[in-house]
UniProtKB/Swiss-Prot annotation:
This is 2-dehydro-3-deoxyphosphooctonate aldolase. One of its GO terms (biological process) is keto-3-deoxy-D-manno-octulosonic acid biosynthetic process. It catalyses: D-arabinose 5-phosphate + phosphoenolpyruvate + H2O = 3-deoxy-alpha-D-manno-2-octulosonate-8-phosphate + phosphate. One of its GO terms (cellular component) is cytoplasm. Pathway: Carbohydrate biosynthesis; 3-deoxy-D-manno-octulosonate biosynthesis; 3-deoxy-D-manno-octulosonate from D-ribulose 5-phosphate: step 2/3; Bacterial outer membrane biogenesis; lipopolysaccharide biosynthesis. Belongs to the KdsA family. Its EC number is 2.5.1.55.
């Protein structure tokens, strides 16, 4: 029987209708966060898609020292708390160190382990101690079967509810590719699988001082992942991605999201028909 992770009234499982995890790459301020959350909540409610809001208070692995990192943990969590209370939607956000886990868990329903940190045992253990759902992004440098080791660590630390996210694999320099087999391979671990359609089109460090990307392939990869049969679709979204402070080339334009989600719902239904 496939593992199902329950979050409030949301059920997350590879055999269930997909859940959308979406929001801007980083928190840019209260007004912007509330604007984006309102748009996404209304859209997902209209389309009857379960929704979890995602945004980061700190982009700790920016390519350049001059890259804008975000509003910081104190202000960021305050804003995410406002989003959560105003729109009654669950929250997922990144943690980068053990010291951030307890404070972040006071607001976030899901703690996300960044791909670059997915093997950091102390961070996994600190996240586990919060009792929250732990969502781990598979490192670009890892084979999908290597996530068994991450699962074993988390289970040893007492985590019952785990989500794994595929976000592409290194392919030469400044490039990622998505191997759709990895979704099925990780699903064999009996963990709900999420596909990160926007970071999968990244070109890490491809712009020299920042990360590049090609958002025209987001829809293509999202369709392919849905056809495999997954628990969740992860997309970073912005009303004006070309002027966003981080990951602009990868993020979906808010105005284009509805048409893509309508298609994904159709594909998801076909994939999961009994």
């Amino acid at each position: 029987m496939q593992k199902i992770v329950k979050l409030n009234n949301i059920k997350i499982g590879n055999d269930l209708p997909f859940v959308l995890i979406a929001g801007p790459c980083q928190i840019e301020g209260k007004d912007h966060a509330l604007f984006m959350a309102e748009k996404l909540v209304k859209l997902t409610s209209k389309l009857d898609i379960a929704f979890i809001y995602k945004s980061s208070f700190d982009k700790a692995n920016r390519t350049s020292v001059n890259g804008i990192r975000g509003v910081g943990i104190e202000k960021g969590l305050e804003i995410l708390s406002k989003v959560k209370s105003e729109f009654d939607c669950p929250i997922v956000t990144d943690i980068h160190s053990e010291s951030q886990c307890t404070e972040t868990a006071e607001v976030a329903d899901i703690l996300q382990i960044p791909a670059f940190l997915c093997r950091q045992t102390d961070l996994l253990q600190a996240a586990a101690k919060t009792g929250k759902i732990v969502k781990v992004k598979k490192g670009q440098f890892l084979a999908p079967w290597d996530m068994k080791n991450v699962q074993t660590k988390l289970q040893a630390f007492g985590v019952k509810d785990i989500l794994f996210t595929e976000r592409g694999a290194c392919f030469g320099y400044n490039n990622l590719v998505s191997d759709m087999r990895s979704l099925a391979i990780m699903a064999e671990l009996n963990v709900p699988i999420v596909f990160d359609a926007t970071h999968s089109v990244q070109q890490p460090g491809g712009l020299g001082g920042s990360t590049g990307g090609d958002r025209k392939y987001v829809e293509l990869l999202a369709k392919a992942a849905i056809a495999v049969g997954i628990a969740g679709m992860y997309m970073e979204v912005h009303q004006d991605p070309d002027n966003a402070p981080s990951d602009g080339p990868c993020m979906m334009k808010l105005d284009n999201l509805e048409s893509i989600l309508i298609k994904l719902k159709k594909y998801d239904k076909i994939t999961k028909e009994k």
